Structures are given as structure tokens and as C-alpha cells.
């Protein structure tokens, strides 16, 4: 007999709930615990599989305790129709879940609980907050579907948050969403999908998949305003056959209209914030609390002449004007920072001009020599020549680019397909 004991707990505003499950041969043989709503939940889950228990509703504390207990232990035999659906608590993932069910699949909702800064000003609007986890669970249970929460707070802090802080300490401008989506988040979700026997992972991202040059590649979503292919660009193409992006052929308003039409409670939920772990704060305030305190240093022109003072080099990125506080006859921009001397070097916009960009680490997913290169999430793509290098690639831009920052992602497109991606390591 295969026996296993699962334990979970949750606390909020002085209330505590805990639950202990005895699992034998894949079913819950016994359940006990204490706290608001726990007794009823224990009664309801006895005799169920752990996956079946994930579809049982309970109060917030009791539900959180159950989710923690079963989160890493959910397992099932492969089912031809089963899919895992990444749930954020928002309208996009809710509609993706609905689409999966309407297509005849057997969806299992999964939410990653990730670390957010407890000192942040608006932690409830982020995609991985306790409120978002609860909203995701309620969406699944309202449709009679199982939902599992994976608590990855410590792993996320180690894999995403700490590199974000250390990148700024080196004078870079890192994009944590690229690191999160390109490796951490999808690795965890795909691993969960394998555990529950899911054939596909479904997400609410606005992106598509396309056959291009004989290979399945990521492609832009049809709505340019919502396209998220830049954030997903570092996904290994070998994983793409296991993914489904049902919203890639539509825009946000179509998604909200669909949610309203089918009565999803998430239809009017506000959009979650980027860089979720900031919990609503400006990144500078976050960095100040997590290892990069205010420290005065000089603002210099290109000849080394002192023009003013600043409160930390890491508060500036190439192309930035706001916060310089330097009076001059012509507009001045941050050109680069010097971490060792805590200096910020400023100059005219012309000094920001770049025509060559090196990416490392980086990859070309198919052989190409001409691309459209997107060097920041909100910037338009620029035509360029590309040459493969040992650990990445080098771009020669047709037109001058301004404010190119080390640490950002260079994402390469041919037509709408993502044909390469890497982290910017040098500019000339």
C-alpha cells in the first residue's frame, strides 16, 4: 500500500488553519485539522484523489491550507484530454480556462504563489498575491474544475528577484519579466503539467505559435497593443509543442467581452502589474529596501566635469531625463553609469546613438541574416543585420537606436515569428 502524509497551513490576521491528509493508493483516506472551515473541508475531501480534492471549495484560510498540502503532491495517470491551465486570477487566464473546457479538454488550474515585497504599496493587484490566488481558485471552482497552488516564493526570490537587484548593482537595466517567463515560470508550470498527466499547458498570454523555416516558433499576437511575445521570447522552441495560447488571435476587449458573455466573475478585474514582486512600488524604492540604499554621487558630463549630485547610480538608465536635476542650455540624458565610482554620465541625445548591439547569452532559433530587432518591450522593432557569435549574436542596425540598455532583451523577428533572443551585453 502506497501511503503518504500531506500537511498544509495558512494564517491571516491572527487566524490559523492547518490540515493533515493521509493518502493511501492515491486517495485521501483520512483528513483532520483545525481552523475556520477546516472541519467541513476535511469531511468533503475524504475518499477523493488529491486532484479531485483540488476541485473542492472552502473558505479562504481552509482553502489555502488544503492548497499547500496538495500542491506539490498532485499526481494522476495521463489523460488524453487533460490540460494544465496557468491561472493568475485575471480575465485572460479565466477565458483561457473557459476555452480549454469548451474545446472538450479536462482542465486543471494551477497558480504559482510567488514572492512579493511585503512593504509594497499595492500588493493585491499583482498576479501572484494571496488575493490573486484566491480569485484563481474561485474561477476554477465556479466551473467545477480543480485548482492547485504551488508555493514557489523562496525559489522565485532566488531565481528572479535577487538577479534583478544584482543587475542594477552592476549598472545594468534588467527586465525581470523576461527571466521569469523565459525560464522560471514556464519550467514550473510544465513540470506540474507532467505530474498531472496534462498533454498541454494553456496560458492567457497574447502570443501565437507558427511554423517558420521548418520549425515551430513563437510568434506575435495579432493585437500589437497586447502582444506578449517579447516577454516569452527566451522560451526554448523545443517546449512550444506543449503550449497553447488561445488568446493570441484576439485583443483585450474581445477577451473581456467573451468573459462577460459567459458570466465569468473575472470579466471586470483590473490588469495585473508588470514586475509583480514590486507590489505597486517604483523599482527605485524597492531597490532601496533590498540592498541598494541611497548614496550620493556625482553627475558628470562626457568630459568629466561635475554638473550635479544624485542619490545612487542605479536610479538611472540610458536615455533617462527625469530626476537628473541638472540645468543646461540643451536637454541632457543619462548616457551610462559607473558603479565603481557611483557616477552618472550625462550628455545630449546624440551621444545615446547606437548602431551595434551584442547579445550574450543569446540564440538564433533558425538561420537568418536579416531581422527586425526589438530592444525594449515598449519600443518598436528596427531592421538589422544579425551575425551569430559563440555565446549569442551581434546586431548591426539599419537606423540609429537611442537609449539601448545593457540587461534588456534583444528579441529578433522575421515576419511575425521570433527567430532569436538574447540579453543585451554591449552597445557601440
Cite the ranges covered by each PLM segment:
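Catalytic cores of large soluble enzymes that bind and process phosphate-bearing ligands
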Residues: 58-65, 88, 128, 152, ...
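Phosphate/pyrophosphate-recognition segments in soluble nucleotide-handling domains
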Residues: 1-7, 60-91
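ATP-dependent adenylation/nucleotidyltransferase module used to activate substrates
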Residues: 77-233, 253-254, 260
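Conserved active-site and cofactor/substrate-binding residues in soluble primary-metabolism enzymes
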Residues: 14-16, 36, 61, 65, ...
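AMP-forming adenylation/ATP pyrophosphatase catalytic core
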Residues: 88-91, 202-209, 214-428
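Active-site- and interface-proximal helix/loop "cap" or "latch" segments in soluble metabolic
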Residues: 14, 18-76
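Short amphipathic alpha-helical face segments that pack within enzyme cores
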Residues: 40-43, 95, 188, 405
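Short, charged/polar N-terminal "headpieces" of proteins
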Residues: 1-20
Amino acid at each position: 500500500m502506497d501511503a503518504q502524509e500531506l500537511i498544509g497551513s495558512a494564517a491571516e490576521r491572527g487566524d490559523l488553519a492547518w490540515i493533515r491528509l493521509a493518502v493511501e493508493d492515491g486517495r485521501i483516506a483520512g483528513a483532520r485539522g483545525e481552523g475556520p472551515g477546516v472541519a467541513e473541508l476535511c469531511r468533503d475531501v475524504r475518499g477523493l484523489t488529491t486532484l479531485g480534492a483540488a476541485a473542492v471549495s472552502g473558505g479562504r484560510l481552509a482553502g489555502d491550507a488544503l492548497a499547500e498540502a496538495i500542491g506539490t503532491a498532485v499526481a494522476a495517470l495521463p489523460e488524453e484530454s487533460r490540460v494544465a491551465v496557468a491561472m493568475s486570477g485575471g480575465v485572460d487566464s479565466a477565458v483561457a480556462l473557459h476555452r480549454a473546457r469548451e474545446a472538450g479538454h479536462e482542465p486543471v488550474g494551477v497558480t504559482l504563489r510567488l514572492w512579493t515585497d511585503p512593504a509594497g504599496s499595492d500588493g493585491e493587484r499583482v498576479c501572484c498575491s494571496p488575493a490573486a490566488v484566491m480569485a484563481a481558485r474561485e474561477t476554477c471552482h465556479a466551473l467545477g474544475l480543480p485548482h492547485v497552488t504551488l508555493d514557489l516564493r523562496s525559489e522565485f526570490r532566488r531565481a528572479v528577484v535577487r538577479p534583478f537587484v544584482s543587475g542594477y548593482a552592476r549598472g545594468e537595466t534588467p527586465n525581470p519579466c523576461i527571466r521569469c517567463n523565459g525560464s522560471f515560470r514556464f519550467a514550473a508550470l510544465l513540470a506540474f503539467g507532467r505530474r498531472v498527466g496534462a498533454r498541454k499547458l494553456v496560458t492567457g498570454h497574447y502570443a501565437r505559435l507558427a511554423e517558420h523555416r521548418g520549425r515551430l516558433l513563437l510568434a506575435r499576437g495579432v493585437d500589437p497593443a497586447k502582444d506578449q511575445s517579447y516577454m516569452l521570447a527566451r522560451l526554448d522552441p523545443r517546449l512550444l509543442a506543449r503550449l497553447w495560447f488561445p488568446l493570441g488571435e484576439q485583443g483585450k476587449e474581445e477577451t473581456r467581452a467573451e468573459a462577460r458573455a459567459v458570466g465569468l466573475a473575472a470579466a471586470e478585474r483590473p490588469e495585473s502589474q508588470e514586475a509583480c514582486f514590486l507590489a505597486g512600488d517604483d523599482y527605485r524604492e524597492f531597490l532601496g529596501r533590498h540592498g541598494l540604499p541611497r548614496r550620493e554621487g556625482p553627475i558628470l558630463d562626457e568630459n568629466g566635469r561635475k554638473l550635479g549630485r544624485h542619490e545612487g547610480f542605479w536610479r538611472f538608465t540610458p536615455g533617462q531625463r527625469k530626476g537628473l536635476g541638472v540645468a543646461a542650455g540643451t536637454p541632457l540624458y543619462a548616457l551610462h553609469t559607473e558603479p565603481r565610482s557611483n557616477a552618472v554620465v550625462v550628455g545630449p541625445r546624440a551621444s545615446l546613438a547606437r548602431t551595434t548591439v551584442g547579445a550574450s547569452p543569446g540564440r538564433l532559433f533558425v538561420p537568418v541574416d536579416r531581422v527586425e530587432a526589438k530592444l525594449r518591450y515598449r519600443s518598436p522593432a528596427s531592421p538589422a543585420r544579425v551575425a551569430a557569435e559563440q555565446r549569442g549574436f551581434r546586431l548591426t542596425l539599419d537606423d540609429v537606436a537611442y537609449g539601448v540598455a545593457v540587461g534588456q532583451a534583444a528579441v529578433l523577428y522575421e515576419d511575425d515569428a521570433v527567430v532569436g533572443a538574447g540579453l543585451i551585453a554591449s552597445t557601440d
